[in-house]
Amino acid sequence: NAYFERPQALAAIAKAIAEAGKSGAAKMRYIPDPDSPGQQICTTPGMPQDVRISPDGSTFYIADMMVDGVHVVDGESFKQTGFIPTGKGAHGIYPSRDGKSFYVANRGSNKIRGTPNGPGSVSVVDFATQKVTKTWEIPGGGSPDMGNVSVNGKYLWLGGRYDDTVYRFDTDTGAVDKIKVGREPHGLTVWPQPGRYSLGHTGNLR
């Protein structure tokens, strides 16, 4: 998290990061928030990828491929309020059409250049409880990246970045179909999508 406008926290953050580097620990590390008694600041170096907002607009969810999960950030204060472990290389986030849950594409690698047949998966997270309710593994391994939910909500389509594949997940059962495509499909857009105006990237419309 970026709290660099607050000098009183810098020394503690720097110390925590240095200790994490010495120990080689990749786990989440927290220090007390000097501005908010009882709250903590995450100091673990990471690489945020995708960002989505809750249906009520109160909370941001940020996938982080270096810490294998999703940061939960309050939309009013911009402070982290939680963390949801999902899977290795958490990358893309896609809300379900009913607005009750969201899907997290775990790319199966913490590296920019991964390898085929990694431990890729999709985590289903409940918006209300902020807990993982299901995990859909990919038989034989895979690397789900970016994509879209179909307009009727029945399928989650994702590019398989390191496997030259596109995945289609059944959102009821988690069953996955694979389509071989060209090299390193990063993202894809399923059409049509609800909305009129494109906000960029893979099918973000409003």
Task: Go through the PLM ranges and name each one.
Residues N1-R206:
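Predominantly soluble domains enriched in secretory-pathway, periplasmic, or organellar proteins
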